[in-house]
């Protein structure tokens, strides 16, 4: 099946939809634009792709003319501000979703810019926005880059409808209604959509009011309360419609669309993707983002792990849906026939690799629990901990002719692995699916910080680590755990960072990479960062915002690096922990080296001051 049209010459008449995206066009099921375009194509609609249009004028948006039904707009696979800036708010030099990996192809706040250009070009034409940027910014939200609470992206973009979550069934329904001639501003009963209405409007679903924007942007307690209400209503079984006030209008979020069934998910992944970037990018060096996913298989969606700093639950939901084993095997067979396949499946995973859709009977019938997490602070008694189906999947994939090795590179939820009384899966992972290093995410060692993160206790990680190395030794292999760690998360004090540094030293862990907490839209941790409150308990949370303290917390996680020693000393003095400065086995750094000691033994390269008296010394003849 060829790529979808990217030029007017490839079109046969007026397209039904034009998808405008901030990413380059990659026709692979790891890219939202590819999935939505193929789903609509399968329903009989014609779709044109407008990837990374020149945004400084509206001319590029006139390329295909008007779509018959609507423009569909997304920023790409990542929020455009996260794609463009580091946590230190420095501009990134690269962009793996753009030609040659170079930055500069999409604007900041891409969804808003694209929609405004479309309005400039065509005026009152239906515009539907979706994807991560739209989904996580659907309500009034804290924006880290301006350090303020911004309005819903639906308001600023002037789009007609916002779709949130995974969009296949939402777009199918919207496309059907638009095709039947229903005006876009009359579509008000589709799940998974957000829209603006007059104050007199009565939602089609039972609703809850979460606040006025003017209050939410100034009152942090009201903001935290609103976030809690949002969080409690993101399940399709019991979630209410949510209403937010904007001057003389209201924003209405209908309840979430139900997740795709296994059968529906199988059909989505069986669509005729080209599984490559468009050939027009070849001259620029291709699209680097394809490299990680080209020979990988996504077997699930959603995540009941529900870490507070992660937006997956707010976007994909806590309900896990998995593809059938047969569907994954068909994809694996297809991968073996692709150009460039060398026998290695790089991943069989998802948001959390070891979750399948058979985890909880209650969740299937009534939704996930409203005020309770599945895994933290301890695993729910209703949770069915079973890796048998995933184990079967891995075994069958590696048995396919042409497959030499199958790796699991997505994150594994280690507390869920430990809870499995059958060790077969654990041993299988260690024996066959680790490429020398297994990446896991303990994130911290301070249990009160881990609680605010929504992560399991450090004791749980220690038990996992001990079991991993025990099995590794029994198998006679040399493999290592690589822990992901985070500094400056809300709740993390300087004392907590020092505790983590001591934990790392004691366990002989020298992390090469650490992540400073990045407050991205749509997460509970970002709510804590802005308000200084835990939205679930109302309790005050310490937030490290001071630049110097954030720098010190980060340096403590890499205390062993000489470049960090001065910063670590300052942190220890600041915390009153001078006992950790010295030469003892428990010390983190040595005392400050005096300037004279630094230069001791070095050749003095300074030129003598003044003129040399007498004759210049004669050069020796060789």
Where are these regions (language model features)?
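Glycine-rich beta-alpha loop elements in corrinoid/cobalamin-binding modules
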Residues: 32, 51-246, 253-254
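Nucleic acid-processing catalytic cores of prokaryotic defense/repair systems
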Residues: 15-21, 28-65
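Flexible glycine/acidic-rich beta-alpha junction loops that bind and position SAM and/or redox cofactors
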Residues: 79-88, 136-138, 168-173, 197-201, ...
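Terminal amphipathic helices with adjacent charged low-complexity linkers/tails
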Residues: 56, 185-234, 248, 257-260, ...
């Amino acid at each position: 099946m060829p790529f979808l049209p990217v030029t007017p010459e490839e079109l046969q008449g007026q397209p039904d939809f034009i998808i405008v995206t901030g990413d380059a066009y990659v026709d692979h099921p790891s890219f939202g634009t590819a999935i939505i375009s193929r789903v609509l194509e399968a329903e009989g609609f014609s779709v044109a792709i407008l990837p990374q249009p020149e945004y400084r004028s509206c001319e590029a948006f006139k390329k295909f003319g008007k779509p018959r039904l609507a423009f569909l707009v997304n920023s790409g696979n990542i929020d455009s501000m996260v794609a463009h800036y580091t946590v230190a708010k420095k501009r990134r030099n690269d962009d793996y979703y753009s030609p040659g990996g170079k930055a500069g192809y999409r604007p900041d706040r891409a969804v808003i810019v694209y929609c405004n250009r479309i309005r400039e070009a065509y005026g009152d034409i239906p515009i539907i926005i979706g994807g991560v940027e739209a989904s996580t910014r659907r309500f009034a939200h804290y924006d880290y880059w301006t350090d303020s609470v911004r309005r819903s992206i639906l308001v600023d973009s002037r789009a007609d409808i916002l779709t949130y979550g995974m969009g296949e069934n939402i777009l199918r329904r919207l496309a059907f209604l638009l095709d039947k001639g229903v005006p876009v501003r009359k579509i008000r009963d589709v799940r998974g959509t957000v829209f603006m209405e007059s104050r007199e409007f009565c939602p089609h679903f039972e609703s809850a009011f979460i606040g006025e924007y003017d209050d939410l942007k100034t009152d942090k307690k009201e903001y935290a309360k609103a976030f809690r209400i949002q969080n409690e209503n993101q399940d399709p079984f019991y979630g209410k419609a949510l209403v937010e006030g904007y001057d003389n209008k209201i924003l209405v979020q209908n309840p979430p669309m139900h997740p795709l069934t296994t059968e529906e998910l199988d059909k989505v992944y069986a669509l005729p993707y080209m599984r490559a970037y468009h050939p027009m990018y070849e001259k620029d060096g291709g699209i680097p983002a394809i490299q990680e996913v080209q020979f990988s298989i996504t077997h699930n969606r959603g995540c009941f792990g529900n870490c507070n700093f992660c937006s997956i639950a707010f976007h994909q939901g806590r309900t896990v849906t998995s593809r059938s084993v047969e569907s994954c095997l068909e994809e694996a067979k297809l991968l073996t026939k692709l150009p460039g396949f060398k026998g290695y499946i790089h991943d069989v995973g998802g948001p959390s690799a070891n979750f399948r859709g058979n985890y909880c009977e209650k969740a299937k019938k009534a939704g996930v629990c409203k005020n309770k997490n599945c895994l933290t602070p301890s695993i729910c008694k209703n949770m069915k901990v079973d890796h048998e189906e995933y184990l079967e999947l891995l075994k069958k994939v590696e048995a396919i002719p042409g497959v030499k090795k199958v790796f699991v590179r997505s994150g594994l939820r280690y507390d869920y692995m430990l809870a499995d009384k059958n060790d077969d899966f654990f041993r299988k992972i260690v024996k066959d699916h680790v490429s020398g290093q297994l990446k896991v995410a303990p994130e911290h060692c301070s249990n009160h910080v881990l609680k605010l993160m929504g992560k399991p206790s450090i004791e749980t990680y220690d038990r996992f680590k001990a079991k991993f190395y025990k099995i590794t030794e029994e198998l006679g292999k040399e493999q290592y755990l690589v822990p992901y760690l985070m500094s400056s998360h809300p709740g993390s004090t300087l004392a907590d960072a020092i505790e983590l540094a001591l934990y790392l030293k004691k366990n002989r862990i020298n992390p090469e990479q650490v992540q400073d907490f990045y407050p991205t839209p749509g997460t509970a941790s970002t709510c804590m960062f802005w308000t200084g409150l835990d939205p679930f308990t109302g309790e005050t949370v310490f937030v490290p915002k001071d630049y110097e303290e954030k720098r010190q917390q980060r340096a403590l996680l890499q205390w062993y690096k000489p470049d960090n020693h001065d910063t670590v000393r300052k942190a220890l003095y600041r915390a009153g922990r001078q006992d950790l400065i010295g030469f003892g086995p428990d010390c983190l750094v040595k005392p400050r080296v005096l300037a004279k000691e630094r230069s001791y033994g070095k050749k003095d390269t300074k030129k003598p001051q003044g003129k040399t008296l007498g004759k210049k010394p004669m050069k020796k003849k060789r």
